[in-house]
Amino acid sequence: MSNFTHINASGEANMVDVSAKQETVREARAEAFVHMAPETLKLIVSGSHHKGDVFATARIAGIQAAKKTWDLIPLCHPLLLTKVEVQLEAIEAENMVRIESVCKLTGKTGVEMEALTAASVAALTIYDMCKAVQKDMVISQVRLLEKTGGKSGHFKADA
């Protein structure tokens, strides 16, 4: 269990002490997909969904979620994010929406969880806004795409 940084020698969960770590610029990108029927995607893209602008709402939800990650994930540190960006793209040929989030800060711990939370909550918001139209949408492939900064260095997911 000693390989898990959030577990102490007694096997108890603890927030990692990052006070001695150096501050570095850290950035993370994550993605998620929401698969849906062509008719549902057309409602979103055309802006004719009765609940309003689905992409704008999902974008704001993702940004808000990144800022509250420490409140949602028990052992995450509260972070002073300097950038949160959420982009949504309708891929009509595949009947899905791709969400990509970017989080950045100068700090002592990474922003991977914030980027993953932003993409996840944006996807959940799309589901919430469209569930009256389609209940069998699928959220998939939530993953970290890239992270930079910190002691562990650069990570880039395989394409």
Swiss-Prot record:
It is an enzyme of class 4 (lyase). The keyword Transmembrane helix does not apply. The active site is at 128. One of its GO terms (molecular function) is cyclic pyranopterin monophosphate synthase activity. It holds the Pfam family MoaC. Keywords: Lyase, Molybdenum cofactor biosynthesis. Substrate binds at residues 75-77, 113-114. Its EC number is 4.6.1.17. Signal peptide: none annotated. It comes from the Bacteria. Pathway: Cofactor biosynthesis; molybdopterin biosynthesis. InterPro entries: MoaC, MoaC_bact/euk, MoaC_sf, MoCo_biosynth_MoaA/MoaC, Mopterin_CF_biosynth-C_dom. The keyword Protease does not apply. Gene3D superfamilies: Molybdopterin cofactor biosynthesis C (MoaC) domain (3.30.70.640). Belongs to the MoaC family. NCBIfam families: moaC (TIGR00581), PRK09364.1 (NF006870). PANTHER family: MOLYBDENUM COFACTOR BIOSYNTHESIS PROTEIN 1, MOLYBDOPTERIN COFACTOR SYNTHESIS PROTEIN A. Catalyzes the conversion of (8S)-3',8-cyclo-7,8-dihydroguanosine 5'-triphosphate to cyclic pyranopterin monophosphate (cPMP). This is Cyclic pyranopterin monophosphate synthase.
